[in-house]
Amino acid sequence: MSLGGKVYYAPRLYPQNYPKYFKWMEQFFKDHPEYEIVHSHIDAMSYLPLKAAKKAGIPIRIAHSHNTSIDRDFKYLLKQYYRCKLTSVLTHEFSCGKVAGDFLFRNDKFTLIPNAVDAKKFYYDESIRNDVRMKLGISSQTFVMGHIGRISYSKNHRFLIEIFKEFHAIKNNSVLLIIGTGDMEEEIKNYAKKSGIDDDIKFLGNRNDIEKFYQAFDVLMLPSLFEGVPLVGIEAQFADLPCFFSEKVPTEVAFSDKTNFISLNQSAKEWAREIANVDISHRDSERSILIKADYNIQTAYKILESKYYELFELIQRG
């Protein structure tokens, strides 16, 4: 915002709100003819803002894919419909990764824009690790398994808890920290209670300081059923944190030697054994391989910046 940007709040994107959301978008574009590019990041649901943008005559309309499947919830059929209609309202296709682009657009015309983060914000810091653990009442000797993400079907929290239960049997002095909220939160909390080890599972809700938790974790867990290129996986690698991903997470997320991909066909016990064998004895505060990564915002922003300049030139040429 320091560069002059503004934030506008649209109605929440719930099914009962779709007509209200679309009308709000129509009015917004009417009131703000100065905007010549609309860049939407809500996957199949991008159909709604881009349809309103097309109606308003906005020349550049970008849909940006961040996922490789659609949650099988009550909105599933509607999202599938919007996905099929999306190409009728967009002018350009962007994606965080190849698999995500293939899924949403079903062609090879999309532009790859890597998910990028401010790498320095996540570099490992022993003092932050100790501080976070102290505030949570976790000793320096305790093994901390961490997960950050929306509590929803795609993140596979039931299996995450099963893995932790098996791991806890191997390494009793361990805890699972779950950061995030979502539509399955109560169901997953109840499942954790039934596991018999819920005293060692902590639900921390949404946080605005997640960069500190990568320091406190010993491993990051993403046993997802589907993903785009997950930002949490990128952030964790900048913190030199060992990561365990399911095979459903695109391998393009990996840029450090501490990423591990395990099949969801393997049992929770097999996952637990793999995690128990990981070396957590040393983490670097800064590694040259990470500095050079495409996911570092200091280099990756140039890709998006150059693309925007290219699109503005298209507009000027008419």
Predicted segments with their positions:
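Donor nucleotide-sugar binding/catalytic pocket of nucleotide-sugar-dependent glycosyltransferases
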Residues: Y8-Y9, S88-I128, Y301
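Acidic anion/phosphate-binding donor-loop and adjacent secondary structure
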Residues: Y14-K20, D102-N107, A116-K135, S140-T142, ...
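Short His-centered aromatic/hydrophobic patch
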Residues: S40-S46, S65
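A charged, aromatic-enriched C-terminal amphipathic alpha-helix characteristic of glycosyltransferases
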Residues: K121, H282-G318
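A conserved mid-protein helix/loop that constitutes part of the nucleotide-sugar donor-binding site
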Residues: F143, H147-E166, D183-K189
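Nucleotide-activated donor-binding/catalytic signature segment of Leloir-type glycosyltransferases, i.e.
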Residues: I188-G205
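Aromatic "clamp/platform" in nucleotide-sugar-dependent glycosyltransferases that forms part
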Residues: N206, L225
